[in-house]
Structure formats: structure tokens, C-alpha cells
């Protein structure tokens, strides 16, 4: 057991250095996209979002959504699933747990 700990202690700096070297460019890429994609909408973008929502509601009323191609329907489903999952991530963060609320 002592030999295992000694070997681990000897290899730890090299492992940490390799992990940092591997992670640094990926973390930079993540921060770039996080700053660009995760910003809240500006006041100028809100009317566009409302207009888009009105178009979706109108297509549901008139039945024009039946004219979508398979690719468009699949992409719309993926976007809806992404929004739904981000809602659940927010719920998990808010609850500070995966299951249930502390009552």
C-alpha cells in the first residue's frame, strides 16, 4: 500500500500537468461560446422573439405546421427538447438536488 501511495505521489505532478495542458484550450473554447451564446436577449431582440412566438401560435391554429418537412420538424423537436432540458437543469439547481424538494 505504501508503495502505491509513493508511486501515485511521484506521478501526480505529471498527471496534473497533462490534465491542465489538455483542458486549457477546451476551457478557452467553452468560455468563448458561453459568453456569446448564453447572454440574455437584448431589448431590441424581444419584439423579434414575440413575433416568432405569434407565428408559432398562428401555425398551430391554422394547421400550417403540417406542411413542415421532416428535417424542419426534427430540428424544431430538438430545439424544444433543448429548452425543456434547460428548464429541468434550472429546476435541479434551484432544488439543489435531482429528486424532490425538501419540505
From Swiss-Prot:
Signal peptide: none annotated. Keywords: Acetylation, ATP synthesis, CF(0), Hydrogen ion transport, Ion transport, Membrane, Mitochondrion, Mitochondrion inner membrane, Transport. The modification N-acetylalanine is found at residue 2. The modification N6-acetyllysine is found at residues 11, 24, 35, 54. It is found in: Mitochondrion; Mitochondrion inner membrane. One of its GO terms (molecular function) is proton transmembrane transporter activity. GO terms for biological process: proton motive force-driven ATP synthesis. It holds the Pfam family ATP-synt_G. GO terms for cellular component: mitochondrial inner membrane; mitochondrion; proton-transporting ATP synthase complex. Subunit g, of the mitochondrial membrane ATP synthase complex (F(1)F(0) ATP synthase or Complex V) that produces ATP from ADP in the presence of a proton gradient across the membrane which is generated by electron transport complexes of the respiratory chain. ATP synthase complex consist of a soluble F(1) head domain - the catalytic core - and a membrane F(1) domain - the membrane proton channel. These two domains are linked by a central stalk rotating inside the F(1) region and a stationary peripheral stalk. Belongs to the ATPase g subunit family. PANTHER family: ATP SYNTHASE SUBUNIT (PTHR12386). Component of the ATP synthase complex composed at least of ATP5F1A/subunit alpha, ATP5F1B/subunit beta, ATP5MC1/subunit c (homooctomer), MT-ATP6/subunit a, MT-ATP8/subunit 8, ATP5ME/subunit e, ATP5MF/subunit f, ATP5MG/subunit g, ATP5MK/subunit k, ATP5MJ/subunit j, ATP5F1C/subunit gamma, ATP5F1D/subunit delta, ATP5F1E/subunit epsilon, ATP5PF/subunit F6, ATP5PB/subunit b, ATP5PD/subunit d, ATP5PO/subunit OSCP. This is ATP synthase F(0) complex subunit g, mitochondrial.
Amino acid at each position: 500500500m505504501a508503495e502505491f501511495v509513493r508511486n501515485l505521489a511521484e506521478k501526480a505532478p505529471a498527471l496534473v500537468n497533462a490534465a491542465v495542458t489538455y483542458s486549457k484550450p477546451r476551457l478557452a473554447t467553452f468560455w468563448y461560446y458561453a459568453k456569446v451564446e448564453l447572454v440574455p436577449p437584448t431589448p431590441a431582440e424581444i419584439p423579434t422573439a414575440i413575433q416568432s412566438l405569434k407565428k408559432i401560435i398562428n401555425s398551430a391554429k391554422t394547421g400550417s405546421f403540417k406542411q413542415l418537412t421532416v428535417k424542419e420538424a426534427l430540428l424544431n423537436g430538438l430545439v424544444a427538447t433543448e429548452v425543456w432540458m434547460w428548464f429541468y437543469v434550472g429546476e435541479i439547481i434551484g432544488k439543489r438536488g435531482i429528486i424532490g424538494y425538501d419540505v
